[in-house]
Amino acid sequence: MLPHISADEAQPSMSRKVYINPNFQLQGQTAHQLPFQVPFQAFQAPLQPQPAIHINPHFLNRQRAMYDQYQREQQEQLMMQQVSASHYRLDPTIHLLATPPPPPAKIISKVSTCLVRKPSVVASGPAVKLAASVPVPTVSSLVQPPLVSISKRKIVRQGALKAAPAVAALHPPPPAKRTRYKLVRSISLTCTPLVKKRRPLREFVGQYALRRTNEAQPNRKLSSKPQALKLGVNKSLSMVSIHGVMYKKISKNKITKLDASSSARVAKSESPRTLQRTLSGRTLFVSGNKFILDPSGCRLTRVSTSSTGATQSSVNRSILRRIDIGGLTYVASPKALNVFVRTSNHVSRAHLITAKQRSLTLLNKSLVKTNVPCAIFQKLGKCVAHSRGKCRKLHDKRQVAICVSFLRGECTKPKCLLSHNVTLEKMPVCRYYLRGVCVREDCPYLHKKLSSKTEICIDFVRGYCPLAAECNKRHEFSCPELERKGKCELPRCVFCKKSPSKRLAKVKSRPKLGSKPVAFTDTAKESSTADELPTSSRYFGSHKEPAEAILTRDDVEQKKPEAEDEDQKEAGAPCPRRRPQLGTLPSFIPLGGEEKL
């Protein structure tokens, strides 16, 4: 071997000589050998004289020993694949001849996570003769299959395959499966099952576990004990006990209370087999004493012991008058000995628990603070639910709607529930201000002008708007739905369904006037005569008679329309109200103090 020369050292002198073995051959290396390994050959003495270079004699022996060990490992691995592990024992005394390793198996499928090779076939050659003293291991017909899946953390083998006889090779090869890009002959289409074998449900395979598919399923041992027949339970008829009260389960999220009559009906409807099973009842142990509960669950009977003396002593030591089991209370019966009867205390206890939970819920709800005003209290000034303690909304007397009768000056109620406090939050917009004619300095109405297309403020309609003048909606007593849609669909709208006023009702009830108005002929004549009187005189001292006639004529004119109205009322003909004709009026109006002058 040449000495190693580093880059830091100086170059060797040119006087050194290098000798190369002329028998060195590269063709002897195979794919499975390492580059430093030399194929084993029988050591022969060189024909030529020994070179001047000295070679360590142990070097070749060490190389030969390494090669022998490698060949031995290859043979052992091959035998492990061919011979079953149960019949093979590794014997260090066996010395096999050095034979070249077989070529690697042909790759069938190669994927990024899976590598599949064709099963290796041992070539039939001359049998290896071993020493007579060395026992030959028996070779089984079962051949361990090669690895079919190699992943990062998991190795899976196929099931054990029996060596097929030589006659099987005469069968034609399985049909090939041709795809678009390749031809696969290793898959047998005739033997592949149509239905995949399902994994058992209770089998658990970890993420990094090794699972063998060739293991036979263990046979379950049949128990010699007689198996009791389990009766099917109808889930729709299942019962639930809540605080000792039985409930029947109707659906998944709904139960109903089961009465005593219905429970007896259910007991009668049971099958005879179930009745025979439940006639004996259940056995309970309470404080060391044995009791039997009847099927109805209403009677608890104590089972007496064999010796009567022991029974009496135990009864005297511990006298049970009351037993509480599962929320139910049993009291000793005064008529029979060792019999306890169920009471209805569990029902009252359930009612008490329910009432307690309800009271706690109400108390917790009363502590909840809300700022939503009560619409009923704002509109009427009174809330019955609030007086009962059920309404949790805000009840503020400052937000009660203002009394409309108070604004007109007509409210005479001493205990009016509506507000008599005039504030801008409750007052509508001043109509005179909208026309521009409001001259009051302390006008209680709201002074702001908005477009007629603006929406009606709903808070103001309810009785109180906290924004007042800063609100961008109209404050008017009108229906918001009618202003928005043009029609109101509310059945009891205060603004749309107003009753007709009293004034319009009176107008409709009044009768019509006659078709021909009464002509005042007398008054017309008298007026003509009055016009003919001289106008030069300012006072009527010289003309007393015409003045008296004028006064009497005015009285007649006032009486005639009243008489006509009475006649028309008696006739009962309805007519709109009309103003009576005045006729010709006098030029001068006489005064009462003119006669004295």
UniProtKB/Swiss-Prot annotation:
GO cellular component, one term: nucleus
Positions of C3H1-type zinc fingers: 397-423, 424-450, 451-478
Key words of the record: Metal-binding, mRNA processing, mRNA transport, Nucleus, Repeat, RNA-binding, Transport, Zinc, Zinc-finger
GO molecular function, one term: zinc ion binding
Subcellular localization: Nucleus
Basic and acidic residues compositional bias, start-end: 542-562
Recorded superkingdom: Eukaryota
Primary subcellular site in the record, as a coarse category: nucleus
PANTHER family xrefs: CCCH ZINGC FINGER, ZINC FINGER CCCH DOMAIN-CONTAINING PROTEIN 3
Role played: Required for the export of polyadenylated mRNAs from the nucleu; binds to polyadenylated mRNA, and is involved in the regulation of mRNA polyadenylation.
Protein name: Zinc finger CCCH domain-containing protein 3
Organism in which the protein naturally occurs: Drosophila melanogaster (Fruit fly)
Gene behind this protein: ZC3H3
